[in-house]
């Protein structure tokens, strides 16, 4: 059997000017995904992917770094303006939005898309520290 050579797919530079920045901010981490208007992922980053471990992942600074990394990667594909969808109760919500703006992306709209149950599943029990 012939050995298959490991060929990596070259990253094609797309020219997408508008997109959507999805910020998922939980109590443990912040994930920033930048997609085109159809929902195809262009760039993503998270606090954990940048090397933050444990409780440092949940800080606003980690969210800021994740948003900057995702913004830089998306701007390489020609991204200029984004709509922001924020989901979750975490500490990094505002920090991530500010970082996207500081990185040079123009924010056209900010939406809170946190799912709210109509009395669905029972929530986890209260923490006793």
Curated annotation (Swiss-Prot):
Assigned keywords, A-Z: Ribonucleoprotein, Ribosomal protein, RNA-binding, rRNA-binding
CC annotations in GO: ribonucleoprotein complex; ribosome
Protein name in the entry: Small ribosomal subunit protein uS11
UniProt-listed Gene3D superfamilies: Ribosomal protein S11 (3.30.420.80)
Protein family (similarity comment): Belongs to the universal ribosomal protein uS11 family.
Record keyword RNA-binding present: yes
Quaternary structure and interacting proteins, as annotated: Part of the 30S ribosomal subunit. Interacts with proteins S7 and S18. Binds to IF-3.
Record bears the keyword Ribosomal protein: yes
Species whose genome carries this gene: Geobacillus sp. (strain WCH70)
């Amino acid at each position: 059997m012939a050995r298959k050579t490991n060929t990596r797919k070259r990253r094609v530079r797309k020219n997408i000017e508008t997109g959507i920045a999805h910020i998922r901010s939980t109590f443990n981490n912040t994930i920033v995904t930048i997609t085109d208007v159809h929902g195809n992922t262009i760039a993503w980053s998270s606090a954990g992917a940048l090397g933050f471990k444990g409780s440092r992942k949940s800080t606003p600074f980690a969210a800021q770094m994740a948003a900057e990394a995702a913004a830089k990667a998306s701007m390489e594909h020609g991204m200029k303006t984004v709509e922001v969808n924020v989901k979750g109760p975490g500490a990094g919500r505002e920090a991530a939005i500010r970082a996207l703006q500081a990185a040079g992306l123009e924010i056209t709209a900010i939406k809170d898309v946190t799912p709210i149950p109509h009395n669905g599943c029972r929530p986890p029990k209260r923490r006793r520290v």
